């Protein structure tokens, strides 16, 4: 008898064939990688196909791969990762979709498929600058409306660009250039071969 993961993997391969870039298993969960062009069709089928039936999106986040693998990574910079749950079949799936353009990361919105994606997509837009095409209300959700940049991008300065303070003379909050001096961050040095149980 096949395990749940084997059954899910077989169902995914039967439903999508070569339209998935990859299917991998790690820590008891499957991850599929989907091209942005196929994303909406794959997402709709993941929800509607009775053999898959992922009726719930439980998380969506953005990722910036700019410094991934200490510079050895040569793929697209931005991705969105969805975590799906099938209550009916009692299994989970991670879906990764890469934005094809690093300058303007654009990924189709899945709000029409899973409405729980609404604020998650706004968060990924706010923090990473990933534009979710077709989102009904794509605007900042965590940072201030006048905020410049996207703070979770790897190239965003740690101290930011501006700081906010209360000005007693103007009796209001004002923005000013950052007054914090840049610091050089010392890299972590691991001197033991098996530091923290990791194999090198």
Curated annotation (Swiss-Prot):
InterPro entries: NADH_DH_suC (IPR010218), NADH_quin_OxRdtase_su_C/D-like (IPR037232), NADH_UbQ_OxRdtase_30kDa_su (IPR001268), NADH_UbQ_OxRdtase_CS (IPR020396). GO terms for molecular function: NADH dehydrogenase (ubiquinone) activity; NADH:ubiquinone reductase (non-electrogenic) activity; quinone binding. NDH-1 shuttles electrons from NADH, via FMN and iron-sulfur (Fe-S) centers, to quinones in the respiratory chain. The immediate electron acceptor for the enzyme in this species is believed to be ubiquinone. Couples the redox reaction to proton translocation (for every two electrons transferred, four hydrogen ions are translocated across the cytoplasmic membrane), and thus conserves the redox energy in a proton gradient. The keyword Cell wall biogenesis/degradation does not apply. The gene is nuoC. PROSITE patterns: COMPLEX1_30K (PS00542). Signal peptide: none annotated. NDH-1 is composed of 14 different subunits. Subunits NuoB, C, D, E, F, and G constitute the peripheral sector of the complex. It is a peripheral membrane protein. GO terms for cellular component: plasma membrane. Keywords: Cell inner membrane, Cell membrane, Membrane, NAD, Quinone, Translocase, Transport, Ubiquinone. The keyword Transport applies. It is an enzyme of class 7 (translocase). This is NADH-quinone oxidoreductase subunit C. Its EC number is 7.1.1.-. Pfam families: Complex1_30kDa. It catalyses: a quinone + NADH + 5 H(+)(in) = a quinol + NAD(+) + 4 H(+)(out). It is found in: Cell inner membrane.
């Amino acid at each position: 008898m096949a395990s749940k993961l084997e059954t899910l993997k077989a169902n995914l391969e039967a439903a999508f064939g070569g339209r998935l870039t990859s299917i991998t298993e790690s820590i008891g969960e499957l991850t599929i990688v989907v091209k942005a062009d196929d994303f909406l069709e794959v997402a709709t089928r993941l929800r509607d196909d009775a053999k898959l039936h992922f009726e719930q999106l439980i998380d969506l986040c953005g990722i910036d791969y700019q410094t991934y693998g200490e510079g050895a990574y040569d793929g697209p910079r931005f991705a969105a990762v969805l975590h799906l749950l099938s209550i009916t079949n009692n299994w989970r799936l991670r879906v990764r979709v890469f934005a094809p353009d690093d300058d303007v990361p654009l990924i189709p919105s899945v709000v029409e498929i899973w409405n729980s994606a609404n604020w998650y997509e706004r968060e990924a837009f706010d923090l990473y600058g990933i534009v979710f095409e077709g989102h009904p209300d794509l605007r900042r959700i965590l940072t201030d409306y006048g905020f410049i940049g996207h703070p979770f991008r790897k190239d965003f300065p740690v101290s930011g660009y501006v700081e906010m303070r209360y000005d007693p003379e103007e009796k209001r909050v004002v923005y000013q250039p950052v007054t914090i001096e840049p610091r050089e961050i010392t890299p972590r040095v691991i001197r033991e071969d098996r530091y923290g149980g990791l194999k090198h």
